[in-house]
Amino acid sequence: MFYLSDLLLHVIGFG
């Protein structure tokens, strides 16, 4: 699921 990976990247970026 590519969209989940993109979402995780955003979360990590904000983290």
From Swiss-Prot:
Induction: Higher expression after 5 minutes at 42 and 45 compared to 30 degrees Celsius; at 10 minutes the protein levels are similar at all temperatures (at protein level). Disruption phenotype: Cells no longer have growth defect on galactose (upon overexpression). GO terms for molecular function: regulatory RNA binding. Keywords: Transcription, Transcription regulation. Changing F2A: Increases severity of growth defect on galactose upon overexpression. GO terms for biological process: regulation of carbohydrate utilization. Encoded within the Spot 42 sRNA (gene spf, a dual-function sRNA) which acts both as an sRNA and mRNA. Interacts with DNA-binding transcriptional dual regulator CRP. Plays a role in carbon catabolite repression (CCR), which prevents expression of genes involved in catabolism of nonpreferred carbon sources when glucose is present. Encoded in dual-function Spot 42 sRNA (spf gene), it inhibits CRP-mediated gene activation when cells are grown in glucose, especially at higher than 30 degrees Celsius (when Spot 42 sRNA base pairing may be less efficient). Overexpression of this protein leads to decreased cell growth on non-glucose carbon sources, with particularly poor growth on galactose. This is Small protein SpfP. It comes from Escherichia coli (strain K12).
